[in-house]
């Protein structure tokens, strides 16, 4: 009887440890992405590819895209926060 109880405790602790370990591995925090209007773009933004290239090359952003913000389309750059 004592061996059975000990075996149950060992099995339970092993499963608990595995669940806690897998829970920590499965959780990966997502980095936040910050958006701000391009400081180097002039005029209306029509082509997102051009905006993306300018944000990446000139402003060291991860990416860029055209979005509407009153009163026109603007180039927005995306950075890791």
From Swiss-Prot:
Database matches in Pfam families: Gamma-thionin (PF00304)
UniProt keyword DNA repair, yes or no: no
Keyword Transferase: no
Any Gene Ontology biological process: defense response to fungus
N-terminal signal peptide: 1-31
InterPro entries the record matches: Defensin_plant, Scorpion_toxin-like, Scorpion_toxin-like_sf
Keyword annotations from UniProtKB, A to Z: Antimicrobial, Disulfide bond, Fungicide, Signal
Disulphides: 34-81, 45-66, 51-75, 55-77
Family: Belongs to the DEFL family.
Function: Antimicrobial peptide probably active against fungi like B.sorokiniana, F.oxysporum, F.graminearum, F.avenaceum, B.cinerea, P.beta, P.infestans and P.debaryanum.
Xref: PANTHER family: DEFENSIN-LIKE PROTEIN 1, DEFENSIN-LIKE PROTEIN 19
Name used for this protein in its record: Antimicrobial peptide D1
Organism for this UniProt entry: Stellaria media (Common chickweed)
Source lineage: Eukaryota, Viridiplantae, Streptophyta, Embryophyta, Tracheophyta
């Amino acid at each position: 009887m004592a061996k059975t109880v000990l075996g149950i405790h060992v099995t339970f602790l092993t499963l608990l440890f595995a669940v806690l370990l897998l829970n920590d591995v499965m959780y990966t925090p997502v980095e936040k992405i910050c958006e701000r209007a391009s400081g180097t773009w002039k005029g209306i933004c029509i082509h997102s590819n051009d905006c993306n290239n300018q944000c990446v090359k000139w402003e060291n952003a991860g990416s860029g895209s055209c979005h509407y913000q009153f009163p026109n389309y603007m180039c927005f750059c995306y950075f890791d926060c």
